[in-house]
Amino acid sequence: MKLETAYNYFEKLEKDERLQNYISQANSRYILYIANEPLENFPHYTVNLDEKCTHIAFSYLNCGWRFFLEKISDEATKCMEKASEILEYLYAYSDCEKLYKEYYRLVCSLAYYISAQYSKSFIILGKYNSDSYIGKITKLFLTRNFIELERQLEIKYLKNDEETSSENKDNIIYEKILSNAFLHIINFIRTGKMESLESSKDMVRDLITLADINNEPHMWWYFRLLYLVFEEYEDGSLWKVVPPLLDNDDISAKYIYANLYKKKPITEFFKSQRECLDGELLKNDGFVIGMPTSSGKTKVAEVTILKTLTKSPGALCIYIAPYRSLANEVEFSLSSMFEIMGYQVSQLYGGSQTSPLDRQLTKQANVIIVTPEKAKSMLRSNKDLKDRIQLVIIDEGHLVGFQPRYITGELLIEELKIVLKKNNGQLVLLSAVLPNISDFSLWIGEDDKAKRMSVWRPSSQRFGELSLARNTVNINWEGETPSYNKNFITPKLVKPERITKTGRKYAAKYFPADKKEGVAATATKMLDVGSVLIYVGRSNMVLSQARIVSKLFEEKGIEHEWRNKNDWLFVELACIEEYGEDSEILSLLKQGIVPHSSKLPTEVRQSIEKLMANDNPKIIIATSTLGQGVNIGVSTVIVSNVRLDESNTVKVNDFWNIAGRAGRAFTDTEGKILYAIDRNKSQWSIYNQIQMKEMYFKYRNIEKATSGLYLLLRYLFILSEEFEIEYSLFLELLAENRESIDEQKAVEFFSEADQFLELLDDTLISMDIMNEANVLENSSSWIDDVFRSSLAFIQAKQDQSFSEEKMIEILKARNSGVIKLAGEETKWHSIASSSVPLRASLVIEHRIDELLKYVRKYIDSDKSFEELLSLVMELDIFIDSLPISKIEGIEIGANFSEIREGWFSGTSIHILEKRHENVRSICNEYYSFHFPWIVNAIAQKIKLIDCQEESKVLEQISLFAEIGLNNNKSVKIYLAGIKSRNCATELSEKIGMDNDLVTPVKELLLEFFNLCVVKKEDCSEICFNWLKLLNDEKEAKEYVKVKRRSFQFNIPFDLHDNLLYIKKVQSEIWLCSFDYKIKIPVLKEKALFNECSDIPDIFLRKEKGDVWILDSHNPYIIFY
């Protein structure tokens, strides 16, 4: 087909409404197939729809082939993707029994791969079954099962040809040439040698010609598509993408091998990753990346980090994750990649403050993962660390707004910009939901072009309505041709109509009776498609919905088994620690039902998230907490309720964060999002529900991310107008702290404004230090340099009522007031390093002698547990007196003494709960977060006046409070992985230690575990289970240890790469070149070769003369 003809034909295909309607019908029918709709319920589709659509698909393939040859990539990709979608609709559902389905599935998979839809290609091949050699090795290649592919090729080349070849002579030729082509592309994957890739493409071109000569169109199409697969493999391959970005061949190869030899090999980058990994963009001082959920942001972060460490080996890279759960996930991902390359990755332990343990870890680390609160504390209290920072990555960067945490996070970024500018470092912001990305690129990169945005996803999405009418659920799927699952859930009689002896009539009861039951029944039926997430707006809805699902599971006999035994054991132990043996949460989890919300205790939530990420839950019931960053995917999302309270609904961007979980890479070609509508309500309610659904389903309705600082300053300005304070007097009021206007007005203004000013004031004093305000003629002149590039300033430009100049004037005025409040410059460091609000910091300064007296009393005592509790009590009383926002519902009263004693002694919360109300809030919110935050601030202040011993005591107590223990040994054991306070206490009495780091403690725990196993050392059952979990995690590492050996022999052949691969077929061992042109049987020292012949990619590398050394590209093989 000529190019002009291809264009004309492609245009005709796209514009022909009749043909496009056939495709829409096939799509509409496909969802009915995969949702197991009975055939009798199908609407009347066009006669011979399969034949018509198959012809259309191959027409697209024909156009795509021509476009690819002419390097017209956009049209080529569109043709291939359209063709593969059509073939998927026709032949890729589970119960398909159509003629030639396997061939069309193979073609579908190849076309998906060519269009860079690697995930969809992988999934379709999972449904492909073929007994043919060609089909098998193609599937092995595209599903990245390189170990089995090489085994098949070994058999082909090292066994008798008659045993492994087809009976058909043409097939024998095809198989030989194709096998050779796969050998060469495997060599390209292993070595990055382009000549091997080119050779493989040349061989496939020969096969295209041969199939044409033999007049075998089915093989001709297969070879054409395979040729384009190899072309795409070149474009997407790590060998093509990574080296130009890193500009260091050695580091590039290490990174590629670390990806290639993972248990699930990564050999290419997604299209979204290639779109965002731009060499020119990476040169910017800052840039923004916008990519949908599950599109591979972490890989973009990896390459950016690696580029920094390649350029500056001693640099420190900081990854800021908004939540601990996401930080845990990122640490696992980054450490599994970088530690094999020799880089140290650490997630800093604990909550919001920097501990001595954190400082030790940062000295050794190349990459640290922190929450914003920890980053703020670390930045202000560790100058040496600050000077090392060369890269900061902000994940979930759209989280700005008027919430206090978002405001302080945004101000932290402004501080980091100052540090990075001084260090010539780089700032990167990642987000999945960022409609106004240009505002952020101007903020982060100071350039509208400092951004890349991709809308590509590894799976498509289908939206629909779950409609409950009376006791029936119908599903209406949206699309060019809508489709319907009518009577998806039909009524089931629960209790028949009855009349009592008194004549009172009771109506019959049916299931589902309400929307909750309808949602539960739909979710249960949708398990045929894959796992389901039910979204509810409020935490108190999670368990009630989960109970309905649980009851359904019991009725239907649905059982579940978690495949990952270690992760499940972690969940069991965490639940027992928090709730005791009789735990409703644990009972639900045993059924494969996962309740998830912010109300879960930290260790339980994190253990559940790890379990979900590594395994396959059946049904998850969750709030928006699950949408923020945690990488958990499902096949179907059902939005059951969007109400947060009577007047507020979930934001559109939170909806899309949740919707983004539908469609798992390498599991689902399509994610399904259902919005539940209760049509049993009034007409007005139904209308409102439909309006809400339509608003959420339109991506363009996502709220723009608005600067919290801008909103805060605008609020202060509006507040001044409400109190009728003239603008000039308002500025004086901020600068003079109540002294410039009528006292009553000042008191009223600050009573409203103080809670917002406390979010800003300590950052201003920290920035005063960074900008050396004390030596400036005007101590606030630096405000112009810093905040005219802020997000607040950029967005204030768009506000006519509150201009950007007013914003700068308000900041300057407030900075003057802050400097007056802070007093002499010698106190500034103390205030900034404390990381608490300015007013609270000043009170601490004023009462520092009183605090020192309490601490010294403890130091001079016998440091018993009672003395520790006495010091904690004094600190509780002091914290309660501070002018700082209190935790709602918590008052330090008489019952605190028993709770305090129980918490610090390691008593499980579920036991304390039996004795006192509100225990969880006191322990998890006050002692685990609020108390350590303030006590650490005190520790930082007294350290600056050279009271080192007193500071160390307070830092220890802060860590004790955060975890709920009372000595360093038990804390180290807890942090090393024994996430039970009871067990950490027990083990601390059995194990001796003197090292301050966590890693050696792990080694001591593993040694003790071996003693428990071998010598039956005394240990409780639950402690033994925690130790076993720690031991199993160590053994689960991907490393293989092999003894490095050398051999001496001579071969009369020229080897291009001086490598001989060790191959074994049955009992025979061979040394072979990668293409098997050289095959040497091993006759001597067979046992030595036998030890490593089953290890993939192990070879002999020729050294000097006749000496050969055992070696491998695989970094997970450790030679000793």
Curated annotation (Swiss-Prot):
GO molecular function ontology, one term from the record: helicase activity
Positions of the Helicase C-terminal domain: 521-710
Residue ranges of the motif DEAH box: 395-398
InterPro entries recorded: DEAD/DEAH_box_helicase_dom (IPR011545), Hel308_SKI2-like (IPR050474), Helicase_ATP-bd (IPR014001), Helicase_C-like (IPR001650), P-loop_NTPase (IPR027417)
Gene name for this UniProt entry: hamB
Record-given protein name: Hachiman protein HamB
Superkingdom of the source species: Bacteria
Entries under CDD domains matching the protein: DEXHc_Ski2
Family: Belongs to the helicase family.
Its biological purpose: Component of antiviral defense system Hachiman, composed of HamA and HamB. Expression of Hachiman in B.subtilis (strain BEST7003) confers resistance to phages phi105, phi29, phi3T, rho14, SBSphiJ, SpBeta and SPR. Probably a helicase.
Gene3D superfamilies with a match to the protein in the record: P-loop containing nucleotide triphosphate hydrolases
Residues the record lists as binding ATP: 291-298
Key word Hydrolase present: yes
Taxonomy of the source species: Bacteria, Bacillati, Bacillota, Bacilli, Bacillales
Keyword set, alphabetical order: Antiviral defense, ATP-binding, Helicase, Hydrolase, Nucleotide-binding
Spans traversing the lipid bilayer: none
Disruption phenotype: When this gene is missing the Hachiman system does not confer SpBeta resistance in B.subtilis.
Domain Helicase ATP-binding: 278-452
Gene Ontology biological process terms from the UniProt entry: defense response to virus
Record Pfam families: DEAD, Helicase_C
